[in-house]
């Protein structure tokens, strides 16, 4: 049964408040500045089918959008009806979620009356993951650190201690890394508690009908925004610094046909034996972000906003690198996708797109030994970036 507009607005506001509280719990309990202060994270709620329904206002496109499209991998490995109350799942597989092994994604099912009704998930940057980490001169993902396939981190409420032991043994800052993992677990629990309270208050058994309504309306709004663009192929090219005096080229074609939009990166540079390659899910995440900023910034970001958009890049290219390519510095290339898309749409949407700015974020990481008893090590990461480009009427 369709939900009336007033009720939908109330339910939507409560859902957003729920995921915002989830993110706030992660930030307030985190052991690291990269989560607490930089907000290098994502938090969201998914329905039983793995569709993202709502995301927190705090987060980055490189975390939230790959996590949104990546939940299908969790449910393929652990079908929803095989999960138990108290289960928690984890992975840092770059080709499943955020395209970098420093980014840990943790998902938790929510149960009501013995049935899994939703999942809460979050993704944030681990202070250290062993190996060479963010170094752009890694030759393969094997050099970059500890690679965690999709695993059950907590089984029916009991910590799977061998996994925690493996993580501790492979990272330079185990207290902070393990501490943040517990923060991620707690954040999902906070979201689950708020969701169950919200469902009880409104007499709902699950979020399926609400999810359908939100996602369908979002898709319709996104399609309406695409339909306002004249049909055609819109092209752009971006050249950025590479290595050994070999620039990296991003070729982009935005193809609009009716209420469907395709972004094709055919012609872009091939993947390289260095850590600046980008997995396709990260390319999709930042491309979707660029599209939404240009044509529909007011439309919610959920599974519905992804449906009308198709993003492709040739396998083995810099924007669709294949395993075991090194991807630790994928942001050095992937962050240029939004500007490349907007450059392509400049003729069609001159008053909506933004000129390119300082797209390539600069991460600085310090590691060392504090000295004294135990030879405890430290690590610290900070971000540096420049200004953004101008827009029509906004220098």
Residue ranges of predicted features:
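Glycine/proline-enriched, intrinsically flexible loops and inter-domain linkers
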Residues: 1-85, 90-395
């Amino acid at each position: 049964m369709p939900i009336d507009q007033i009720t939908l607005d109330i339910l939507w506001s409560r859902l957003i408040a729920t995921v915002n509280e989830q993110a706030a719990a992660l930030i307030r309990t985190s052991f690291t500045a990269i989560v607490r202060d930089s907000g290098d994270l994502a938090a969201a709620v998914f329905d039983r089918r793995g569709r993202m329904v709502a995301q927190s206002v705090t987060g980055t496109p490189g975390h939230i959008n790959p996590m949104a499209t990546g939940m299908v991998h969790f449910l393929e490995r652990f079908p929803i009806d095989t999960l138990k109350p108290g289960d928690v799942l984890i992975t840092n597989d770059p080709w499943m979620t955020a395209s970098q092994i420093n980014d840990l994604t943790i998902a938790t099912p929510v149960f009501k009356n013995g049935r899994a009704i939703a999942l809460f998930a979050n993704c944030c940057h681990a202070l250290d993951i062993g190996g060479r980490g963010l170094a752009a001169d890694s030759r393969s993902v094997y050099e970059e650190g500890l690679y965690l396939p999709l695993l059950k981190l907590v089984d029916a409420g009991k910590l799977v201690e061998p996994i925690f032991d493996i993580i501790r043994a492979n990272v330079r800052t185990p207290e902070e890394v393990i501490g943040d993992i517990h923060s991620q677990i707690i954040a999902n629990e906070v979201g689950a508690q708020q969701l169950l309270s919200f469902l009880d208050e409104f007499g709902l058994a699950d979020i399926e009908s609400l999810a359908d309504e939100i996602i369908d309306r979002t898709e319709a709004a996104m399609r309406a925004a695409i339909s306002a663009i004249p049909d055609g192929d819109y092209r752009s090219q971006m050249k950025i610094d590479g290595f050994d005096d070999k620039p990296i080229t991003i070729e982009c074609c935005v193809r609009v046909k009716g209420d469907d939009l395709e972004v094709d990166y055919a012609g872009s540079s091939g993947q390289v034996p260095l850590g600046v390659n980008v997995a396709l899910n990260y390319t999709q995440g930042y491309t979707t972000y660029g599209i939404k900023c240009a044509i529909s910034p007011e439309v919610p970001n959920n599974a519905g906003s992804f449906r009308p958009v198709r993003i492709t890049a040739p396998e083995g290219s810099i924007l669709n690198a294949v395993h075991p390519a090194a991807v630790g510095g994928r942001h050095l290339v992937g962050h240029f996708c939004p500007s490349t898309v907007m450059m392509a749409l400049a003729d069609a949407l001159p008053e909506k797109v933004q000129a390119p700015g300082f797209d390539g974020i600069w991460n600085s990481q310090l590691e060392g030994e504090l000295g004294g008893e135990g030879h405890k090590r430290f690590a610290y990461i900070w971000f540096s970036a420049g200004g953004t480009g101008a827009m029509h009427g906004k220098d």
